Amino acid sequence: MGYLFEETLSSNPKTPIVVDDDNELGLMAVRLANAAAFPMVLKASLELGVFDTLYAEASRTDSFLSPSEIASKLPTTPRNPGAPVLLDRMLRLLASYSMVKCEKVSVGKEQRVYRAEPICRFFLKNNIQDIGSLASQVIVNFDSVFLNTWAQLKDVVLEGGDAFGRAHGGMKLFDYMGTDERFSKLFNQTGFTIAVVKKALEVYQGFKGVNVLVDVGGGVGNTLGVVTSKYPNIKGINFDLTCALAQAPTYPGVEHVAGDMFVDVPTGNAMILKRILHDWTDEDCVKILKNCWKSLPQNGKVVVIELVTPDEAENGDINANIAFDMDMLMFTQCSGGKERSRAEFEALAAASGFSHCQFVCQAYHCWIIEFCK
């Protein structure tokens, strides 16, 4: 039974409402039905530079900014005179998700002002070399190239096939990137795994004593750049397709080598596979891992950095939310790609000839897993 705390419901948003299970479920359902608004507002805010603007101001003065002040400080000054009003509407949504802090002030008339919350630092465009940034991840996930694949989800369930291929003329993701320089650059800028690597290096000791470290599918080489900055004695080999290396900068102690991990892998006494295996089927993973195994000395290892899915889909578990969100991203973006459980990683290690695998430590949403020869 519900309890009415005031005589009637009205248009006054401060009027308490009937509290009961059905009402709570209804509110949750409405929130889910309109959930598309938040990620799209988040994406636009990142593209506009809102978080960088607010965070820079908070770092200097710890002060709040009005929407008009925010608009005037954006990297691109809006030509639209109504921009502050629109920014205010966007920011109050972000405030409801605790991404920014909102307060009301009276300066002639009452208005809302905003300040960055600590979580904003994970979304700063200019923070990739510091802790890594999720800004590019949001932007690429909601780029039209990936959005178009979601429209194929129902048909893939009913008829089979590959969501990405259905949306893009039968092409696979990594083949497509070779034809779209804009999207390839955007994809290769996704930088939060740098934060994962830096966090892991705070506790992971597995690179001590390594002489030659090969990053298989290393993209632009930023992972090896981080590792060799801590272990300058290591010779790093950043191994990837030619199109991926085209945008790779120079890092001290790192050599960029072009090739195909499905054909062979450069020799090293340790290797990294960072967020590579989740792109591929079990069969393809075994091919990659067997090539790594062949190029390792006895007692060599592959350092696998991957998300590990929980065995149960527990309600309210943030790790489960992240794991299964990302699993669905793999479902739509990579044919046969998926996130895996501990048991599935152990099975891959065994099928590829490794003696065992061990789950060493966790950094944010990823585990550091050693596949030992």
From Swiss-Prot:
It is an enzyme of class 2 (transferase). S-adenosyl-L-homocysteine binds at residues 217, 240, 260-261, 274. One of its GO terms (molecular function) is O-methyltransferase activity. PROSITE patterns: SAM_OMT_II. Its EC number is 2.1.1.-. Keywords: Methyltransferase, S-adenosyl-L-methionine, Transferase. InterPro entries: COMT-like, O_MeTrfase_dom, Plant_O-MeTrfase_dimerisation, SAM-dependent_MTases_sf, WH-like_DNA-bd_sf, WH_DNA-bd_sf. The active site is at 278 (proton acceptor). It holds the Pfam family Methyltransf_2. Pathway: Secondary metabolite biosynthesis. Gene3D superfamilies: Vaccinia Virus protein VP39 (3.40.50.150), Winged helix-like DNA-binding domain superfamily/Winged helix DNA-binding domain (1.10.10.10). Disulfide bonds: none annotated. One of its GO terms (biological process) is methylation. Belongs to the class I-like SAM-binding methyltransferase superfamily. Cation-independent O-methyltransferase family. Involved in indole glucosinolate biosynthesis. Catalyzes methoxylation reactions of the glucosinolate indole ring. Converts the hydroxy intermediates 4-hydroxy-indol-3-yl-methylglucosinolate (4OH-I3M) and 1-hydroxy-indol-3-yl-methylglucosinolate (1OH-I3M) to 4-methoxy-indol-3-yl-methylglucosinolate (4MO-I3M) and 1-methoxy-indol-3-yl-methylglucosinolate(1MO-I3M), respectively. PANTHER family: O-METHYLTRANSFERASE. This is Indole glucosinolate O-methyltransferase 3.
